[in-house]
């Protein structure tokens, strides 16, 4: 097993592996853990040991390598340069979908053509959405771009592909009565705060579970979204990833802490302090400072929210929606009450205005009514019937 140790860099743990290659040269490899230094020493140590056990030295690549093998090699190259959550997503797509297809066909990297890739996309479109195929394309294109950079192939065959068009997304959402009913039935449950954050503030699941008490200012009445928590599947295991980063820069935002949310959070804070006192040494210390924890201090897992939410709806006879649809419900209620699209973009933390407009433009009916009335007035035809 190779030697290794943990290093701290910009507030995060990195696993540093030291080994000697086939030519006798000493090498060092840095691997991002995605774990913040504070409160994650044990998890970082476990990550380091797993990396030491599973480490394999990179084998030089040549143009006659199978495309399937090249894709796997590309994963090892990018592992230390992308976030853990990003790598987990790439790894699952490559290992579970792309590699099995191309390995079965034994196509060499230098023999790979645009038609080979196009045939793969057409095959996949028989079972998955266009959005999924677009993600596959992004991985294949990046990997082949790297192959061009290494002079293994002259050009990128993925450049010649006709990508499938992404389907227009039609958001599902609750109206005001349904949201109020949801607040009512979730009160006192483990899902109460995730539902409150999702429906009122439009938070993503990772933002909700990553919320910490130090991001809530009870004096200035603000709540700041700046930390995320999620779980990812990587190498056959599910790992929890906590990061002092959000989906994009715009996602890091400060919103008003309204009275009814403030009151409930203060109650919850007192409940957690009492639970900590009652549990004593049995209380879980790993997630101290997080808002969404259970009675013994353990974090509420993302999967619990995703699975428990529809069960709660079914138990109380509410229409089935996903947890993420609470974010859409928040946007639709803001639109219905005259909030401009630009302000909704900032509230939700979208990176650009077009994202907000593309998702919610079909809901903005009130602005179309105003436009129709303006046309009628301009033409002197009179008011709408």
Question: What is each model feature region?
Answer:
Residues 1-10:
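Short N-terminal "domain-start" leader segments
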Residues 9-12, 19-115, 268-287, 365:
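N-terminal DNA-binding module of tyrosine recombinases/phage integrases
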Residues 37-40, 75-152, 168, 299-304, ...:
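N-terminal core-binding DNA-recognition domain of tyrosine site-specific recombinases/integrases
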Residues 108, 159-160, 220-226, 322, ...:
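Short functional hotspots where side chains directly engage DNA or cofactors
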Residues 127, 180, 184, 188-191, ...:
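Short, basic (Lys/Arg/His-rich) helix/loop patches that form interaction surfaces
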Residues 134, 149, 153-155, 159-213, ...:
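Basic, Lys/Arg- and aromatic-enriched nucleic-acid-binding interface segment
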Residues 181, 185-187, 234-241, 337, ...:
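DNA/chromatin major-groove-contacting recognition/catalytic segments
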Residues 220, 231-252, 259-261, 267, ...:
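C-terminal secondary-structure termini that scaffold catalytic or DNA-interacting sites
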